[in-house]
Amino acid sequence: MTITTLSRQNIQALTPYQSARKLGGNGTIWLNANEYPTSPEFQLSGKDLNRYPEPQPQRVVQAYANYAGVSTENVLVTRGGDEGIELIIHTFCEPKQDAILFCPPTYGMYAVSAETAGVLSKSVPLTDDFQLNLPEIKNHLNDVKVVFVCSPNNPTGNLLKQSDILDLLQITAGKAIVVVDEAYIEFCPEASVINLLKNYPHLAIIRTLSKAFALAGLRCGFVLANPELIDILSKVIAPYPIPVPSADLAEQALRPANIATVQALTQELLSNRQWLAKALLVLHQVEKVYESEANYLLIKCQNGQAVFKALWEQGIILRDQNKTLHLQNCIRITVGTRNECEKVVEAIKEVK
């Protein structure tokens, strides 16, 4: 008997999530993980590191509640958005009995988190224009306890129609939790569904400081939901999820002056996105640039593998989507600095 055979059967069969960092590469320009291109500068207080952190750092809870326009009772701080995903699955799904439902092409961690927990997965692909297929979702809700949707959707970049999310909430009422992943909402804040929280107790929203706040290394995310749902999740979350240094920096990031800085830098990035989209459209290798409301662009190439490989060899690391459902020959490009965007365009232009 080996150590592997002692592990759970579903773990033995598990294909782990291939994060951008795990895929690696020897890059000088990293545009594969939807990270912000520059790092903010904060100072750690360095105090109380000998003490365990608060179960929920109250200054961070209050600061995020103020930022999001909700009560502190609506906020749970997590180790990145991914812990929020895992937490909801562990809390609401019975292993080998219940299922989650997700709509590919979308973020891969929904399925991986369910598989790790021994929970079944159902997938209802998005429509050709990357919107929810509500009739098919309705037909597949048996045994589903959690439905995950992502808006703006990763990797396609588009927003889901709010009217469709509203319909989804109505058909799942009393049956399942609906999780709307808003990791990229700072790039289109007017599209948030946060105003629906008060009327739909089965709605949970995933947020993060990893994208527009440029703090991916901090691992700080949030679940926003009604107080009853937050209380249930609080029973399951680890006792000390947020390290003191992470809480310290998160609280600084959520101060009004820094939020104003984030909003200004976001506008600069959106300008870079617009420039990049226009520049890519005229390249002979690029067949389509999909509309995006996030900090990345999805492009379809004549030969996506050739483009990806050519840039990889030059140290420009993008995210290959060729094996993703309905995204053959597609590449996802994180919007970087203007200089990085220019180098991407020049490199693709040279691909034969």
From Swiss-Prot:
Its cofactor is pyridoxal 5'-phosphate. It catalyses: L-histidinol phosphate + 2-oxoglutarate = 3-(imidazol-4-yl)-2-oxopropyl phosphate + L-glutamate. Its EC number is 2.6.1.9. InterPro entries: Aminotrans_II_pyridoxalP_BS, Aminotransferase_I/II_large, HisP_aminotrans, PyrdxlP-dep_Trfase, PyrdxlP-dep_Trfase_major, PyrdxlP-dep_Trfase_small. One of its GO terms (molecular function) is pyridoxal phosphate binding. HAMAP family: HisC_aminotrans_2. Homodimer. NCBIfam families: hisC (TIGR01141). This is Histidinol-phosphate aminotransferase 1.
